Amino acid sequence: MALSLTGCTHEGPHTGCDEGSLNLLFTYDGNTASFDQTIAEDIELYLYDGQGKKMDERHIPYENIKGGKPYPLELSYSGNAYLVAWTLTGNEDIKKTSPALHDDESYSTARFSMGEHATRLSSAYNGSMQELFLRSMAFTHNRQENRILSVDVQKQLCSISVTIEEGSSFATRYPGTLSIAIYGSSHSYNIAEDKQNGSRIVIEDSFAYIESSNEYVAENKVMPASVDSATGQRDNIVVTI
């Protein structure tokens, strides 16, 4: 996709640029009407050059893009670049690291362990990249060209479920702590330093017992966690006893 990200949309003499030559139009499910504050209250936008160096970082309030309002972007650059954006909901300070320019790795494999006791995976792990969208593009020096890039937000809500085969003995043998090792790329996660070892992520969490459903439930501490806009439910680690 050839896009102009330098110069102005005006022809002839003028005193400045009111708008950038690239407009970003945020959509959800392919239309602007579906993109509201239940999808994102703010946008964190990052631009990287072809070598992975961050060129620009912007915080875009929802008010600036609501109702399908185009967001003008102006930057002097020529060459291949990457546009990465995160949607933010609530008062979260996520400080995500962009996965741009890293090799794609499978987020479908998760390995679970609880001490020396083997557990079995009862549902696949789909990744937890909260509403991430990523586009690559080529920037040109065409100063008169005005383009609109529609960026569709894709939600990736996931759930991690582990079934303990001994049943109710879990409560006495493993009192409330589950260690989970997720193998795969961790560039899109914000992990405490003592929980990070290369591409291996170790999550340690305490569970609360839900008597009505006979489950130990804890919120996934891997950030960012996906959020279902309809229910407000976040990614959870669910252990059935």
Please name every model-derived segment.
Residues 41-101, 172-241:
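Tryptophan-paired
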Residues 4-7:
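C-terminal motif of bacterial Sec signal peptides marking the signal peptidase cleavage site
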Residues 150-157, 222, 226-228:
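Conserved "repeat-terminator" motif of extracellular CCP/Sushi domains
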Residues 139-145, 154-158, 165-176:
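Secondary-structure boundary elements
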Residues 9-12:
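Bacterial signal peptide processing site
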Residues 65, 91-147:
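Structured interaction patches on ligand/partner-binding surfaces of diverse proteins
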Residues 18-24, 158-160:
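Structural beta-strand segments of beta-rich domains
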Residues 26-39, 163-172:
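Structural motif
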